[in-house]
């Protein structure tokens, strides 16, 4: 999906962090916690990206018995495909994640065609059907702030399955590090909120109600210049 790549450099101060936390809390709200053993399913579906912490968490889910099989899904996306000045990954996200997970081969299924979130679900669904793997309940894992968008995508692209979402911990403050900068995280939070509205309008995901205070924080961050991850062909304020 196209994105607006020419956003101006933005400063992250206390106010920007406060707005971003509003978006973070909204995006991550559907995620299950790890109490009482955490969610369980027929598979764990790990959505590919540039963040290998997702692979590490998928391995943790498998080791604690969340599911007997982990499906790693993803070819290359914009970033892992070399977009925005990033180094192109030599292998698919699914392959990189599987290796990073350290899981035994019999616990892993690779889906290496998907290039977006909807395809993560539709391609994994097709692969499981081809392999005769019955899926009635499943656990999706991805970057924490993708909880709402992942579940909204699953509702359209893999209906008939009871989905839970679980991701690595740390919260808003613990997400960023030398490789994952605050300004980039905020741009992703902004872009994913826009996508909830835009993709539902296009029939790519289920509708999600966005409360007024979340829309207000989003608009403030757009005005502050955190627009690098917005869909360029869609309205900046889609509500």
Predicted regions located by residue number:
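A conserved mid-domain beta-alpha-beta active-site/ligand-binding segment of alpha/beta enzyme cores
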Residues: 176-236
């Amino acid at each position: 999906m196209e994105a607006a790549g020419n956003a101006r450099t933005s400063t992250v101060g206390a106010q920007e962090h406060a707005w971003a936390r509003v978006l973070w809390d909204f995006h991550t709200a559907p995620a299950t916690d790890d109490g009482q053993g955490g969610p369980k399913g027929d598979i764990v579906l790990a959505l590919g990206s540039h963040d290998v912490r997702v692979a590490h968490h998928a391995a943790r889910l498998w080791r604690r018995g969340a599911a007997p099989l982990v499906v790693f899904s993803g070819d290359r996306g914009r970033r892992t495909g070399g977009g925005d000045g990033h180094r192109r990954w030599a292998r698919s996200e699914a392959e990189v994640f599987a290796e990073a997970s350290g899981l035994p081969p019999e616990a892993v299924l690779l889906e290496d065609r998907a290039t977006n979130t909807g395809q993560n679900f539709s391609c994994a669904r097709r692969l499981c059907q081809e392999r005769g793997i019955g899926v009635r309940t499943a656990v999706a894992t991805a970057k924490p702030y993708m909880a709402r968008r992942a579940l909204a995508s699953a509702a359209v692209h893999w209906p008939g399955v009871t989905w839970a979402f679980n991701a690595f911990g740390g919260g808003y403050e613990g997400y960023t590090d030398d490789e994952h900068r605050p300004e980039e995280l905020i741009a992703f939070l902004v872009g994913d909120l826009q996508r909830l509205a835009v993709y539902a309008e296009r029939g790519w995901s289920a509708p999600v109600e966005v409360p007024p205070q979340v829309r207000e924080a989003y608009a403030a961050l757009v005005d502050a210049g955190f627009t690098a991850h917005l869909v360029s062909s869609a309205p900046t304020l889609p509500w």
